[in-house]
């Protein structure tokens, strides 16, 4: 347990006080989201500098003379600049954004499927590709561990009694739904945030590229115990995953 906590802190895979940036990415989708964010912030800084310069220039020029504005009737060049420049910036930001949106939304040839169902106020998981000894689909419920029952190294409001186990370097499809109200299945390090709506099956995928323990939470206000719906995913080698499946 202490080893897991140490690795999570080293890799920034858990929420931390006063955090100002993303958790470390563990999937290509999350890596793309972080890269898009950094690029957009860079373009916004350029636009901010340009607008600030224009405001400063105008305020200093017209501050020198109360009648200076009378001698400027047209400014076709500046009008062209303030029309063309924002349009080009928007196109530069829009194309990578749309590409990433469609890539994250596309689920192609997954190796396995995990179904997550949100309920007030816990999660229910189903491994539809695997059967237990009785010939039934492997499924279990996951509840938050109360604060007074936490052991050393476990995280308050994040640890659960039964975590999702996934194999590393495997294309996994997550099918998300709800049995009552709208929930949201959110895993920051994996770049997953998808609504769990009753009567609807939403899907997304993840290729988790490193082992570790990842935490998420329900990110849709779903009732008085909304904060008591954490998500915990343990990513292990394929051999360990198969051993875990055999034990279910």
UniProtKB/Swiss-Prot annotation:
GO terms for molecular function: copper ion binding; cytochrome-c oxidase activity. One of its GO terms (biological process) is ATP synthesis coupled electron transport. InterPro entries: CcO_II, CcO_II-like_C, CcO_II_C, Copper_CuA, Cupredoxin, Cyt_c_oxidase_su2, Cyt_c_oxidase_su2_TM_dom, Cyt_c_oxidase_su2_TM_sf. Mg(2+) binds at residue 220. The keyword Cytoplasm does not apply. Keywords: Copper, Electron transport, Magnesium, Membrane, Metal-binding, Mitochondrion, Mitochondrion inner membrane, Respiratory chain, Translocase, Transmembrane, Transmembrane helix, Transport. Cu cation A2 binds at residues 218, 220, 222, 226. CDD domains: CcO_II_C. PROSITE patterns: COX2 (PS00078), COX2_CUA (PS50857), COX2_TM (PS50999). Residues 57-87 are mitochondrial matrix. It is a multi-pass membrane protein. It catalyses: 4 Fe(II)-[cytochrome c] + O2 + 8 H(+)(in) = 4 Fe(III)-[cytochrome c] + 2 H2O + 4 H(+)(out). Cu cation A1 binds at residues 183, 218, 222, 229. It comes from the Eukaryota. The chain crosses the membrane at residues 40-56, 88-104. Its EC number is 7.1.1.9. Component of the cytochrome c oxidase (complex IV, CIV), a multisubunit enzyme composed of a catalytic core of 3 subunits and several supernumerary subunits. The complex exists as a monomer or a dimer and forms supercomplexes (SCs) in the inner mitochondrial membrane with ubiquinol-cytochrome c oxidoreductase (cytochrome b-c1 complex, complex III, CIII). Component of the cytochrome c oxidase, the last enzyme in the mitochondrial electron transport chain which drives oxidative phosphorylation. The respiratory chain contains 3 multisubunit complexes succinate dehydrogenase (complex II, CII), ubiquinol-cytochrome c oxidoreductase (cytochrome b-c1 complex, complex III, CIII) and cytochrome c oxidase (complex IV, CIV), that cooperate to transfer electrons derived from NADH and succinate to molecular oxygen, creating an electrochemical gradient over the inner membrane that drives transmembrane transport and the ATP synthase. This is Cytochrome c oxidase subunit 2.
């Amino acid at each position: 347990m202490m080893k897991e906590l140490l690795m999570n802190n080293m890799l920034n895979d858990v929420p931390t006080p006063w955090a100002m940036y993303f958790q470390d990415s563990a999937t290509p989708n999350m890596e793309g989201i972080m890269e898009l964010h950094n690029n957009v912030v860079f373009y916004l800084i350029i636009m901010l500098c340009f607008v600030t310069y224009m405001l400063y220039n105008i305020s200093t020029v017209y501050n020198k003379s109360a009648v200076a504005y009378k001698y400027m009737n047209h400014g076709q060049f500046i009008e062209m600049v303030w029309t063309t420049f924002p349009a080009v910036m928007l196109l530069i930001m829009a194309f990578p954004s749309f590409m990433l949106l469609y890539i994250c939304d596309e689920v192609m040839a997954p190796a396995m499927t995990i179904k997550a169902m949100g309920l007030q106020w816990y999660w229910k998981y189903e491994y539809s590709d695997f059967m237990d000894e009785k010939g039934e689909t492997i499924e279990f419920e996951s509840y938050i561990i109360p604060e007074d029952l936490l052991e050393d190294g476990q995280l308050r409001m994040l640890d659960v009694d039964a975590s999702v186990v996934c194999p590393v370097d495997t294309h996994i499809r997550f099918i998300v739904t709800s049995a009552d109200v709208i929930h949201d299945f959110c895993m920051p390090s994996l770049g997953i945030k998808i609504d769990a709506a009753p009567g609807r099956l939403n899907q997304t995928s993840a290729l988790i590229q490193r082992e570790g323990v990842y935490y998420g939470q329900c990110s849709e206000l779903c009732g008085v115990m909304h904060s008591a719906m954490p998500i915990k995913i343990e990513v292990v080698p394929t051999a360990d995953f198969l051993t875990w499946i055999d034990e279910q």
